[in-house]
């Protein structure tokens, strides 16, 4: 029943777009409700019904401004499709939720998610190759953003000290999750305050802070041969480049080869964009920041993880907070990186 209602909403959302759909399939219901669409000419598209109230129309239009600028810079991102009357977004009713949302359409991006290609059984050389490519992609996007001048109408939230570790962080008060013990809560609050102070001191110099993707984890990167495509720009924000890099690494921290993954990703980044040692020294802290922020994100979206996964995530972050308190938070030491030809 729920699936049928979503498919009905998708058909309504497609009406304003210049596409004659012959097949619509539900792909995912997470931050957005996402569909794969095929038209009568065999072309494929991605349709997204954006989470109601998460972003204003102005913020969504700003997302499109940046993705179009990235396309113009030669960076692989999904190509947006406008409605017949030239709008980037169409409005659609969601009867199941009793709400209206904005819908967007883009050409289908080929490839397989990087997440599906990397696990504990993956050969080290493949891990290094993929994460060197990922580091280079993040650096390329940071280069574009650092030189880009958004128009006055550009509106996005800030993942700065307040947005990440403030008293009202963008993804919620993670220290108030119901399954956190009093001792864990005190540790999270202590760590949050210290990280907030650290980020304030770090500052927002344009060489380290601009518009960022902010969610370029391996599930949001498609691998198609030697090409990586960045997808899902729903969380773009003003933020730090090293936070962007930390997001790319965060989900791989518990893999046995994380040392090699980290080394490859950083080298791929540095092959494309110069980065100061002062900035790289912030990477362990940004990895912790990402983990803490994710606790808040999943607390508001429990359907995206099992209780066991949520507990494991929380326990891992608590262990990192203890390392941070003890002054031993660091990145793992990796064997020498296998030298790879740059793919960017």
Predicted regions and their residues:
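An alpha-helical support segment within catalytic cores of ATP-dependent transferases
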Residues: 5-13, 146-150, 165-213, 340-341
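Active-site activation/catalytic loop segments of kinase-like enzymes and analogous catalytic loops
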Residues: 241-274, 288-305
């Amino acid at each position: 029943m729920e699936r049928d209602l979503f498919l009905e909403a998708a058909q309504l959302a497609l009406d304003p777009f210049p596409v004659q759909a012959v097949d619509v399939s539900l792909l995912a219901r997470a931050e957005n409700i996402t569909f794969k669409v095929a038209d009568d000419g065999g072309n494929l598209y991605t349709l997204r019904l954006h989470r109601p109230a998460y972003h204003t129309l102005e913020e969504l239009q700003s997302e499109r401004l940046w993705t179009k600028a990235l396309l113009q810079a030669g960076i692989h991102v999904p190509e947006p499709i406008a409605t017949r009357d030239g709008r980037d977004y169409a409005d659609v009713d969601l009867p199941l939720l009793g709400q209206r949302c904005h819908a967007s359409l883009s050409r289908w991006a080929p490839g397989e998610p990087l997440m599906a290609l990397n696990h504990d059984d993956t050969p080290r050389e493949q891990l290094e190759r993929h994460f060197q490519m990922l580091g280079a992609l993040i650096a390329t996007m940071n280069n574009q953003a650092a030189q880009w001048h958004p128009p006055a109408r550009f509106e996005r939230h800030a993942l700065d000290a307040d947005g990440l570790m403030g008293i009202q962080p963008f993804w919620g008060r993670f220290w108030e999750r119901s399954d956190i013990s009093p001792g864990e809560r005190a540790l999270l609050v202590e760590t949050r305050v210290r990280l907030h102070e650290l980020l304030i001191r770090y500052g927002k110099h344009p060489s380290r802070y601009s518009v960022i993707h902010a969610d370029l984890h391996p599930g949001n990167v498609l691998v198609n041969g030697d090409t990586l495509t960045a997808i899902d720009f729903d969380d773009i924000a003003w933020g730090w480049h090293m936070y962007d890099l930390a997001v790319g690494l965060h989900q791989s921290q518990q893999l046995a080869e994380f040392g090699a993954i980290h080394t490859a990703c950083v080298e791929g980044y540095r092959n494309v964009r110069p980065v100061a040692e002062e900035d790289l020294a912030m990477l362990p802290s940004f990895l912790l920041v990402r983990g803490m922020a994710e606790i808040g994100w999943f607390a508001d979206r429990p359907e995206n993880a099992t209780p066991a996964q949520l507990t494991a995530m929380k326990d891992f972050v608590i262990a990192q907070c203890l390392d941070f308190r003890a002054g031993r938070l660091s990145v793992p030491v990796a064997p020498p990186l296998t030298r790879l030809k740059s793919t960017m």
